[in-house]
């Protein structure tokens, strides 16, 4: 039995009509618009519908994915073959202290002209050079390991060194200076050269000056630790701070302060009487000797003042302290009995009446003083002369005021 045929799909014309219908619905009323935005929107809708609902930028995404795939392949090839990268040296670093990367791969073609080093032993010198070992000492070079050639070389060297100055255990000053200034390392060379007879190693237990400064520096302690340390040093047999102990302490401190001020003032008085004026203010000088104020007659611009002797009254400056007892105060409190302490209800009216009577009496006394005899009024006015200003108009006309102004 032959297989069933697949149901026939819609024809191309039907699909095209549907797309045109969708475009017409989405752009209804926008075809006659001449704006740039409307026209772009219409074109975008047409492209989307004609493409079957897929965004036209999907092709661009495929190209982007292909490009990223190629870059990933290139990175994978680079990680496999590891090509030599250009070396970069920090500022201030000697290039000869760095091994050439091309030389390690066997690709350097510059030879002696290369600015980097072709000595592979430099990589073994990465470890920090010890300051307590002299590199010229050969401890492992024992006589048991020598052959005839080595023995002959040592003998010749021994006899040749006898002509030199004898060696010593004194440390080289250039070496110490380089160590103190942190300049000692694999590439440091002594100014005396390889023939330097002094030691280039520190003796065991030697402490540098810079380390001594760090040790001598006192350890800083925080404020909290200091307070806790002082509290622990006080011990347990201490007076507990209460209101009574605080008031007693405050009273004692005030008395000590007052006694100190009195003693200081007495000392200054004694010094002033002996002619010593150092540490004495001007106010204290005038208080000790008020006669200094009256130094002559008053001149123009001076201020007038009175001179009097100041009396010291210790009773005014006395401090009295009274301890409050809440229990005694609560026992002494009682309710108001109302006997002799309640104001009358008409006290305000009585006060107003008394004030009115007093004001009326004062007004009557004042009127009697101003008018002692009302029957005989005073007539102190001078007689008036009627002919005083008769010829005044003619005199004013004769005045030549314009000429004077000119």
Swiss-Prot record:
Zn finger residue spans: C3H1-type: 94-121, 166-203
Spell out the residue ranges making up region: Disordered. 1-70, 336-382
Please name one Pfam family that this protein belongs to.
DFRP_C
**Entry superkingdom:** Eukaryota
The residue ranges flagged as biased composition, category Basic and acidic residues, are 12-28, 56-70
InterPro entries cross-referenced by the UniProt entry: ZC3H15/TMA46_C (IPR032378), Znf_CCCH (IPR000571), Znf_CCCH_sf (IPR036855)
Question: Could you tell me the keywords of this UniProt record?
Answer: Coiled coil, Metal-binding, Repeat, Zinc, Zinc-finger
Q: Which PROSITE patterns match?
A: ZF_C3H1
Q: Which GO terms describe its biological process?
A: cytoplasmic translation
Give the Gene Ontology MF terms in alphabetical order: mRNA binding; zinc ion binding
Coiled-coil region(s) = 57-82
Q: Name one GO cellular component term.
A: cytosol
Q: Does the keyword Metal-binding apply?
A: yes
Q: Where is the composition biased (Low complexity)?
A: 1-11, 38-50, 352-364, 372-382
- Its family? Belongs to the ZC3H15/TMA46 family.
Q: What is this protein called?
A: Zinc finger CCCH domain-containing protein 15 homolog
């Amino acid at each position: 039995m032959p297989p069933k045929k697949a149901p026939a799909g819609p024809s191309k014309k039907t699909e095209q009509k549907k797309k045109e219908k969708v475009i017409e619905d989405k752009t209804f009323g926008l075809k006659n618009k001449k704006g740039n935005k409307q026209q772009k929107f219409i074109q975008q809708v047409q492209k989307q519908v004609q493409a079957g609902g897929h965004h036209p930028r999907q092709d661009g995404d495929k190209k982007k994915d292909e490009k990223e795939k190629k870059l990933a392949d290139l990175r994978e090839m680079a990680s496999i073959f590891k090509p030599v990268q250009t070396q970069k040296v920090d500022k201030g670093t000697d290039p000869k202290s760095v091994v050439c990367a091309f030389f390690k791969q066997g690709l350097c073609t510059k030879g002696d002209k290369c600015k980097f080093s072709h000595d592979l032993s430099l990589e073994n010198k990465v470890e920090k050079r010890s300051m307590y070992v002299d590199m010229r000492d050969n401890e492992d070079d024992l006589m048991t390991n020598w052959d005839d050639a080595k023995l002959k070389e040592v003998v010749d060297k021994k006899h040749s060194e006898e002509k030199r100055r004898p060696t010593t255990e004194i440390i080289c000053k250039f070496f110490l200076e380089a160590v103190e200034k942190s300049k000692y390392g694999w590439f440091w060379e002594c100014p005396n050269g390889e023939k330097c007879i002094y030691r280039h190693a520190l003796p065991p237990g030697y402490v540098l000056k810079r380390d001594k400064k760090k040790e001598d520096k006192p350890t800083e302690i925080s404020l909290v630790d200091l307070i806790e340390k002082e509290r622990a040093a006080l011990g347990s047999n201490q007076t507990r701070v209460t209101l009574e102990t605080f008031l007693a302490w405050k009273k004692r401190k005030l008395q000590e302060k007052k006694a100190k001020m009195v003693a200081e003032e007495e000392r200054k008085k004694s010094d002033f009487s002996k002619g010593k004026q150092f540490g004495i203010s001007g106010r204290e000088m005038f208080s000790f000797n008020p006669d200094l104020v009256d130094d002559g007659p008053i001149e123009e611009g001076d201020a007038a003042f009175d001179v009097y002797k100041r009396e010291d009254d210790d009773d005014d400056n006395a401090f009295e302290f009274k301890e409050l007892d809440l229990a005694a105060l609560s026992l002494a409190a009682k309710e108001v009995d109302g006997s002799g302490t309640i104001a009358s209800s008409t006290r305000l009216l009585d006060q107003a009446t008394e004030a009115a009577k007093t004001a009326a009496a004062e007004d009557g006394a004042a009127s009697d003083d101003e008018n002692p005899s009302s029957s005989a009024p005073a007539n102190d006015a001078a007689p008036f002369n009627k002919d005083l200003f008769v010829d005044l108009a003619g005199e004013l006309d004769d005045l030549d005021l314009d000429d004077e102004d000119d």
